């Protein structure tokens, strides 16, 4: 299911995830059988591939700031509920971007009381918060840039869908200091095989 990025566009209907599991699970299994042989050894992992992960892990594990994980998580939840709900406007999103930026700065001052490596729920929750905060930042910043309404993004200042200017995927990069870089990618409207026909995008009207 996690492999079905953008298959359903801006708003996936709930039960369609079953199709994702069947289709993409089959594709993943076929690709794995093509690239891996039973009993085949894996090449050694480059140290550079793991050092960045370990540095982040140890930095968070040994954090000795002034703000608790629970406090930061609650601030993030409230900010997203208030400023990144389905119905948004520019003023609300602008304020949300600022608040999430402040919370990201506060994350540098997080406090862990337990530095052990055994059953350390404090560490697990802080690592999870770091991941959630990254997702929250790119979500609200992407929404703030998209000047239209599409799928689950209902922008009250731009109530109509705008295929001419916004028929594109938002791509966001986030660095270790919570600085983001915004980009876009064209939507592929053709299928990758001749088994099915392409379906032209149309407005979803209820």
Features from the language model and the residues they span:
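Glycine- and aromatic-enriched mobile tails/lids
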Residues: 2-206
């Amino acid at each position: 299911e996690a492999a079905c990025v953008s298959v359903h566009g801006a708003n996936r209907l709930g039960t369609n995830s079953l199709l994702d599991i069947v289709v993409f699970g089959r594709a993943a299994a076929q690709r794995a059988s093509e690239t891996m042989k039973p009993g085949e050894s894996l090449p050694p992992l480059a140290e550079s591939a793991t050092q960045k992960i370990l540095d982040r892990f140890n930095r968070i594990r040994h954090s000795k700031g002034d703000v608790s994980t629970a406090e930061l998580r609650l601030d993030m939840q409230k900010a997203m509920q208030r400023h990144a709900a389905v119905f948004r406007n520019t003023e609300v999103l602008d304020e949300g971007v600022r608040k999430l930026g402040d919370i990201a700065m506060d994350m540098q001052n997080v406090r862990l009381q337990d530095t052990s490596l055994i059953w350390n729920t404090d560490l697990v929750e802080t690592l999870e918060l770091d991941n959630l905060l990254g997702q929250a930042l790119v979500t609200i910043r992407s929404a703030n840039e998209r000047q239209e309404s599409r799928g689950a993004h209902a922008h009250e200042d731009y109530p109509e869908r705008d295929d001419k200017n916004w028929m594109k995927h938002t791509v966001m990069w986030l660095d270790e200091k919570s600085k983001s870089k915004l980009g876009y990618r064209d939507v592929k409207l053709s299928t990758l095989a001749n088994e099915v026909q392409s379906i032209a995008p149309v407005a979803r009207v209820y």
